[in-house]
Amino acid sequence: MKSDLEIAREAHLDPIEKVAARAGIDEKYLEPYGRGVAKVDLDVVTHNRDHSCGKYVVVTAMTPTPLGEGKTTTAVGLAQGLEKIGKHSVLALRQPSMGPTFGIKGGAAGAGYSQVLPMEKLNLHLTGDFHAIGAAHNLLAAMIDNHLHQGNELDIEPHSISWRRVVDINDRALRNTIVGLGSRVDGVPRETGFDITAASEVGVILSLATSLSDLRARLGRIVIGYNRSKEPVSAEDLHAAGSMAVILKDALKPNLLQTTENSPVLVHAGPFGNIATGNSSVIADRVGIGCGDYLLTEAGFGADMGAERFFNIKCRIGGMRPDAAVLVATVRALKTHAGRYKVIPGKPLPPAMLEDNPDDVLAGAANLRKHIEIVREFGVSPIVALNVFPTDHPDEIDAVRKVAEAAGAHFASSTHVVDGGDGAVDLAHAVVAACDHKADFRYTYDLEDSLVEKLTKVATKVYGADGIDIAPAAAKELAHFEDLGYGTFPVVIAKTHLSLSHDPSLKGAPTGWRLPVREVRAAVGAGYIYAICGDMRTMPGLGRHPAAERIDIDDNGETIGLF
């Protein structure tokens, strides 16, 4: 089979105006960025308000291996498969971060004959949204340090400042830094650091904002630290929010691209799935829901991560109710959850893992069953989509089917990587069938619940924990947040994506464990409280041999080695 890059280059790209027309978007709403990409004006949301009758389907997954299980690829294949059976679809995806693109994971444009095009633009700068997020974020950081240097009129306590700087590259050397070194004219020395841009609260705000005015208001509510009276200091207090909004004005508009079979794709925002909300934008979904029979929207990592935040946060803010959820599974992930194999990024799979062994599949099935249960807990119909690899065996595929159907889920195997939309026709039919059953959608918690109650409900109802253990400092901070009026915020639990628990070594569906909450923070602009459980890093590092070593450019200006 040809490489992803070869397939992407050989694919026929329709003019973006034609792709927009296929989605019912008039050319007057487009701002083209070359032949294959366009920004979509926000007026489309108003124009489509009376036509918002498409089915709303979230694409999530079982707990993945470190390699990922092909969720984006499956979402692309499904969009193409729906077109094959005469159902118009629009796909909404997050924009990939350049950090993982140059790291081990590589890009996030799909694979094989189920890719988003132009692939190179998508995996790199696209229309510059991430640069705008970084610029707005770092402008606020600069204004904080300038305020300290100019006399600190707001009486900010420097040690309370939580607003770090960001860059869209994996760079562990920047995790902890000291700024303001030099002479007195170079600022006030203090410890700080860098996060990756995908971890920025500004990026989360972009993904959750429902309008330009909402974006502006959320930016103003960002809390960067506290004054010496322990009162929050906001971006509005620093007079930074207006300039930040100006930088982000165009970034608020979704980006229109296409699949290898020319189906429309809206790519917008890219907050991380383990430490942030992990979903594409509310605005992109509002655009897409009025443009097709089915809107497919991808949520990061497993159903315990991005999908939980999709249901409890994104759907609340967007005011939309999902009709079904696609759970992507793989034979290799099921075998990993049997606890008998170790998958290491950058290394080949263990040879024994590729042998025909349905017993190993069944031994890891508890994880898939738990994710089906999670989706059903939200009152939504689950469809297990088995992303088939060439090394999978028929009786292993049949074992997955039996597990899924016994747990009350629809099931379809899919060969979309090799066969494009034709390989996802069965999956498309399964999604249509699931959407025919009216969902009884419900949230995990009420916003009126206390913050502790919300965290407990997510831990017990979604993850399967027996309860939560809150560190004394975290408990004190939660009480402080309640006093500040943040008690009605939804919650995000920042934890590993490699386990249903906080411990990446616990595979399957762990029982008899409690979730330790060691720290809590407030993302006031985005509008949620997040609890940190386990060792979570907001700035990744590069591996021994990152993908960046293999990427180059030839004499004709063609990229080499991007995947």
UniProtKB/Swiss-Prot annotation:
Which Gene Ontology molecular-function terms are recorded?
Answer: ATP binding; formate-tetrahydrofolate ligase activity
Q: Does the keyword Transport apply?
A: no
Q: What is its EC number?
A: 6.3.4.3
Its pathway, per UniProt, is: One-carbon metabolism; tetrahydrofolate interconversion
* Example GO BP: tetrahydrofolate interconversion
Q: Give residues annotated as binding ATP.
A: 65-72
Query: Record's InterPro entries?
Result: Formate_THF_ligase, Formate_THF_ligase_CS, P-loop_NTPase
Which reaction does this chain catalyze? Answer: (6S)-5,6,7,8-tetrahydrofolate + formate + ATP = (6R)-10-formyltetrahydrofolate + ADP + phosphate
SUPFAM superfamilies membership: P-loop containing nucleoside triphosphate hydrolases
**Which Pfam families did the record assign?**
FTHFS (PF01268)
Q: Which UniProt keywords apply?
A: ATP-binding, Ligase, Nucleotide-binding, One-carbon metabolism
> Which protein family is it in?
Belongs to the formate--tetrahydrofolate ligase family.
Q: What is this protein called?
A: Formate--tetrahydrofolate ligase
Source organism of this protein record: Cutibacterium acnes (strain DSM 16379 / KPA171202)
